[in-house]
């Protein structure tokens, strides 16, 4: 099995062990404390539910727990910062008391990130790559925490109006390069950055598949690569219509492809199932000439 080269990175986290990226693929488990997320909305609204899910993910092998309190699915209704904080604070407090793995806050709002970081989150995952809220980059710089910069265009309620590309892979790479520069200008150290091509965000199904099929090209950005294909609707271009949980088989295929192309982190909903996929894909990498 010939796998793409995967460079190693060490991403520091204040007050705890760094993320060591490269020797094996890290698994990020998703917990949405929302009533309307496309895959698991409503399943973790209660802090005790969020805690139990996080404990199960950690026990299954999750390396990071990603907590979000606003659905960013296409067409989702925006949530104000006060409501987002009210949702995320009790969840992060409960999760941080129950698991030792790093917690990531999935938000594009500086005020939400600040509240989450104060309660134990130590990574910021921003779908807008510091574009929606100009205060988020400086906040990340101040705290010295890792940041995940995801690619999108427009806002969740109009992103598909921006899904026009002549060369989707080249343009996503160029946009991420601009995001990296935006982070630099905000004072964020390059060694703290992780990039995410944003499958399903401002991309039609075939465009997401094209990005997924060309992940090796993102190596030119020389940063750790996170991929989030989990249960996304772009898979319907290959499978036909399926419910979110029925997309786990497609997710497994996407995760395997991403790892063989050099992805460092995969973001998934079903950690218990996907951890086995990740381990087999890593075994294929280690058996190949480019491991």
What are these regions (language model features)?
Residues 35:
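Catalytic-pocket segment enriched in acidic/His residues
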Residues 2-7, 13, 22, 39-53, ...:
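Active-site-adjacent loop and "lid" segments of alpha/beta metabolic enzymes
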Residues 199:
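Active-site metal-binding loops of divalent metal-dependent hydrolases
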Residues 52-68, 261:
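Catalytic domains of carbohydrate-active enzymes, especially glycoside hydrolases
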């Amino acid at each position: 099995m010939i796998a793409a080269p995967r460079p190693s990175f060490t991403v520091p986290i204040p007050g705890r062990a760094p993320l060591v990226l490269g020797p094996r693929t890290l698994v990020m488990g998703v917990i949405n404390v929302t009533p309307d997320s496309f895959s698991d909305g409503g399943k973790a609204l209660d802090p005790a539910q969020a805690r139990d899910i996080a404990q199960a993910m950690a026990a299954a092998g999750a390396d990071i727990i990603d907590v979000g309190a606003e659905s960013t699915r296409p067409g989702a209704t925006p949530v104000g910062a006060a409501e987002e904080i009210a949702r995320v604070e009790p969840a992060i407090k409960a999760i941080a008391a129950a698991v030792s793995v790093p917690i990531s806050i999935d938000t594009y709002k500086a005020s939400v990130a600040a509240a989450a970081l104060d309660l134990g989150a130590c990574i910021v995952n921003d779908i807008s790559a510091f574009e929606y809220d100009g205060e988020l980059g400086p906040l990340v710089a101040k705290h010295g925490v890792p940041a995940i910069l995801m690619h999108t265009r427009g806002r969740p309620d109009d992103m598909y109006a921006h899904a026009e590309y002549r060369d989707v892979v080249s343009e996503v790479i160029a946009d991420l390069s601009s995001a990296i520069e935006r982070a630099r200008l905000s004072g964020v150290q390059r060694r703290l950055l992780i990039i995410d091509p944003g499958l399903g965000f401002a991309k039609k199904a075939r465009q997401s598949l094209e990005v997924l099929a060309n992940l090796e090209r993102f190596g030119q950005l020389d940063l750790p690569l996170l991929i989030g294909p989990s249960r996304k609707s772009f898979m319907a271009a290959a499978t036909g219509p399926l419910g979110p949980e029925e997309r786990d088989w497609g997710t497994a295929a996407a995760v395997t492809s991403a790892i063989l192309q050099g992805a460092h982190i995969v973001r998934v909903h079903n950690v218990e199932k996907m951890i086995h996929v990740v381990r087999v894909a890593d075994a294929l990498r280690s058996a190949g000439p480019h491991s």
